[in-house]
Regions:
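Extracytosolic ligand-binding ectodomains
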Residues: 1-219, 226
Length: 226
């Protein structure tokens, strides 16, 4: 439900991989569109050093350049470090109206923001979906007032129904990939019912049929199947 790496689209999965969240091939374009709308003229980019980070960074870089936005530098960062002042120094030396942080809010991405604020290098952050969460707001508060980002979501009829069901169950439906997780679980159950089996081969055989039947959907990704 939260696997968005573009590389997974062409994965040799033997028919066993499905996802209810859109690929970062689209997410990166949307984030670039928002960057343009916010009048950013130049941006430095840092990404978590894995397939998710590299894939999204590549798409975002190409998309912002297509909008005429200057990319001053693109660097990877490793998660789990205690200090990110070196990475921020590299980003700062390249300059930019903002720094795009493609990573995780509880890992290196948060460290990049902290080091940027501590040094005064940047005060505007472009945030990938993995950086969106209440804990980031709790950590930095008003220091994020110039920042922006994007994450997959839905405003369709199914999303409204899910929000009511989730609220009744004490679940915050606005959380990242909550709706997509529900979709994924529901599709697995429906595929099991359709094949009258919990065998993985049977589930894989039936999951697209039940998805395309539009029996249940809450997310944009699932909407597109119908």
């Amino acid at each position: 439900p939260s696997a968005t790496s573009p590389g997974l689209t062409t994965l040799d999965d033997n028919g066993y991989f499905f996802r209810t969240a859109p690929s970062d091939a689209r997410g990166g374009q949307i984030l670039a569109n928002i960057t343009k709308d916010r009048k950013v003229k130049s941006v430095a980019i840092t990404y978590t050093n894995n397939d998710y980070g590299k894939g999204l960074a590549d798409v975002y870089e190409a998309a912002v350049k297509a909008h005429g936005i200057k990319v001053t530098t693109v660097i990877a960062h490793e998660d789990g470090k205690a200090d990110y002042s070196s990475e921020v120094a590299t980003l700062a030396s390249a300059g930019g109206d903002a720094v795009a942080v493609i990573g995780y809010l509880d890992q290196g991405g948060k460290g990049i923001i902290q080091a940027s604020l501590d040094s005064g290098a940047f005060d505007t952050f472009v945030l990938s979906d993995g950086m969106i969460g209440q804990s980031l707001v709790d950590a930095f508060g008003k220091d994020l007032k110039k920042s922006f980002g994007s994450m997959p979501g839905s405003t369709g009829k199914g999303a409204g129904v899910f929000a009511k069901v989730a609220q009744a169950g004490g679940i915050d439906s606005s959380g990242p990939y909550t709706g997509e997780s529900y979709d994924a679980a529901a599709l697995i159950v429906l595929a099991m019912q359709a094949g009258n089996s919990a065998d993985r081969a049977s589930i894989a055989k039936n999951v697209m049929d039940v998805a395309n039947a539009c029996l249940l959907y809450t997310s944009d990704a699932a909407d597109e199947l119908c």
